[in-house]
Amino acid sequence: PGISPAHEVDGRDLGGRIATAVSHLPHEQREVFLMRMQGDLPFKEIAKIQETSINTALARMQYALAKLRDELKADYRDIAGGQP
């Protein structure tokens, strides 16, 4: 059967919203997020690249995920007409 055109458009739109939200992250958080999610790098390697501790790299990822969650939740509420 495959994916319906409406679902395909929704998927692209969601991808665009995610990309926009990622672009709003502070540089260091965005860098950690992308190295981990796109580059599949371990946190030990990310910490080495950023010349910081593993704990700092982990914290940056946690902050990035929290900010993305908040921004995307707000997007979802706007789309759903104010519903959570």
Annotate each PLM feature.
Residues 1-23:
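Acidic, proline/glycine-rich intrinsically disordered inter-domain spacer in sigma factors
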Residues 26:
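ABC transporter NBD signature
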Residues 32-36:
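A short pre-motif secondary-structure segment
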